[in-house]
Curated annotation (Swiss-Prot):
Residues marked Transition state stabilizer (site): 473
Pfam families named in the record: Alpha-amylase (PF00128), GLGE_C (PF21702), GlgE_dom_N_S (PF11896)
Catalytic site positions: 386, 415
Species in which this protein is naturally found: Myxococcus xanthus (strain DK1622)
Biological function: Maltosyltransferase that uses maltose 1-phosphate (M1P) as the sugar donor to elongate linear or branched alpha-(1->4)-glucans. Is involved in a branched alpha-glucan biosynthetic pathway from trehalose, together with TreS, Mak and GlgB.
Protein name: Alpha-1,4-glucan:maltose-1-phosphate maltosyltransferase
Biological process per Gene Ontology, one example term: alpha-glucan biosynthetic process
Family indicated by similarity: Belongs to the glycosyl hydrolase 13 family. GlgE subfamily.
Record-listed E.C. numbers: 2.4.99.16
UniProt keyword terms in alphabetical order: Carbohydrate metabolism, Glycosyltransferase, Transferase
Subunit relationships: Homodimer.
Swiss-Prot/TrEMBL catalytic activity: alpha-maltose 1-phosphate + [(1->4)-alpha-D-glucosyl](n) = [(1->4)-alpha-D-glucosyl](n+2) + phosphate
InterPro entries in the cross-refs: GlgE (IPR026585), GLGE_C (IPR049171), GlgE_dom_N/S (IPR021828), Glyco_hydro_13_cat_dom (IPR006047), Glyco_hydro_b (IPR013780), Glycoside_hydrolase_SF (IPR017853), Ig-like_fold (IPR013783)
GO molecular function list: hexosyltransferase activity; hydrolase activity, hydrolyzing O-glycosyl compounds
Amino acid sequence: MTERLGSVFIEGVSPELDAGRHAVKRVVGERCTVKADVFKEGHDVLVAVIRWRQVTPRAQQTDWEEVPMRFLGNDRWEGEFPLTRNGRYEYTIEAWPDLFRTWTSELKRKVDAGRDVRSELLEGAALLEGAVARARTAKQPDDARVLGEAAVRLRQPPSPDLLAVALAPELADVASTHPDRSLARRYDKVLEVFADREKARFSAWYEFFPRSAKRDGVTHATFRDAEGWLPYIQQLGFDTVYLPPIHPIGRTARKGKNNSLAAAADDVGSPWAIGASEGGHKAVHPKLGTLEDFRHFVETAQAHGIEVALDLAFQCSPDHPYVKEHPEWFQHRPDGTIKTAENPPKRYEDIVNFDWMGPARESLWAELESVVLHWVKQGVNTFRVDNPHTKPTQFWAWLIRRVQEAHPQVLFLSEAFTRPKVMKALGKVGFTQSYTYFTWRNFKGELQEYLEEITQPPVSDYFRGNLWPNTPDILPEFLQNAGPGAFRLRAALAGTLSSVWGMYCGYELCEGRPIPGKEEYTDSEKYQLVAWDLDRPGNIRDWIARLNAARRTHPALHQYGTLRFFSSNNDRVLFYGKRTPDGGSLVLMAVSLDPYAAQEALLHVPLEWLGARPDETYQVHELMSDQRSLWQGPDVQVRLTPEQPAALWAVHRFRRTENAFDYYE
């Protein structure tokens, strides 16, 4: 909008990510709350609105909708608009002086001061006549009639009745419906918000290698075999099953057991070394089955209430068809050989790098986009992206936007264990979720500091942390050779501190045998088939199932951004809570951080956060033990053990009285 004298200032807009370069994230069903400083010189009464629309293929023809903003004080304004559909929205702010309300405000002061207001009444009549014309243009004849009649009366000599008409709030309401926006100012940026589907904010992931589904450590399983795991995963309470790469595996420089550089003839290799004579990123490993078998696996998973997430690893083995067909897509050394991949200190001799920003990048990027769309066509709507921080963020921004323009339901999880700013940049350019440093946060202060950072604005506007206590790559020190208590408490933390969490197969069996001196599993499943005994003594399957059931049935635990930490007098006990925005579901949680010994703590319950009075008695339902208690007051004593290291209390306040009984009257 062009500059005008007396312009309104619009500043401090929130949410606004990096001056509007990136979209903020929300979920369908939420309302996008927007705040801004809106002010003008003088004493004019201002009006501010949010202009918003959903971006569609016909967006250029779509009219913008407007919702009013509320004045909060100190020139701060707030408004919100609904996110009813999955996809991208645009929004901005427009504000202008409400000339008629400004006039009525000045008129009242002059009347109260006993001033002659004949001239002011004529000014008001002129303002109303302008509103009449705008009402007629808007085809609102009733409004035009009301405004016109009032304008005629204001041209009569002043009287108490006439002043009552002029100052009537109802007249100002009608006049403000047809404002003079000639002095309006529109914010100089059009901002974006992306509304993801619900699983972006609430989901529970289970990772397993389908090739080990036979569970004998010898026989390469098929997708049909892997379908046999789905009831088990469902019983554990997971709604997303994540599969490592399912494509043909290269033979050149194939890795042997425990990442050995010398593979035996029967070694299955790392599934991240993608591509062989049987095909590349659009093919499935022949020992797993066919593309039709994969589609059947996806459909069977859906029948169990489980979504399939696929690993998206944009890298190739030296045997990948791309290497021969498109050598221009790869990085070459001065001697002409193709570079192998590295993620220092790790080196991947069985993988070669794409030349992401080379002369052939347009055709490379287009092909990789077609890979994603190929798997979307097979029923995959969630991708876990391998090492995205080693590829250009420009590529991810381009790819994710392109895919979501056609398929807004597609989710992308960033597997980037790297520097904080790089991880956050990946969230900004579009990744739906991200792995986190939770894997290495074990104690009270560091857990609270980190979770407060990633679950509160501004970081939570673009970054959703998916908490994993383990991965095939990472067996953290805290879990190495640990007992079930360690696995229970870390699962409880992951599943309640965030609304999205995941674990790699074997966690429920308390598998914790490391390679000495490393954070890696011995006999890692990345390089061999594993014989999983799902009934292994000492497993915590029931604990995991109860945890996921509690998450599923209590909406407070579906929330990502409502996490709040509360006071515990024991540094070995973390106390926190979550609630739905309307307060209809509240859950308090206490988790022991000691896997070896019992811990007691005095918890200070946040009565104001609960909405409870100090003298009020309320019920708590402990979800892991299914025990109910009555609490009163702010202080509660708790004892946690390695066998029961977490307590999850759903809070119920007694609100009903006899007045609500059907026959009270």
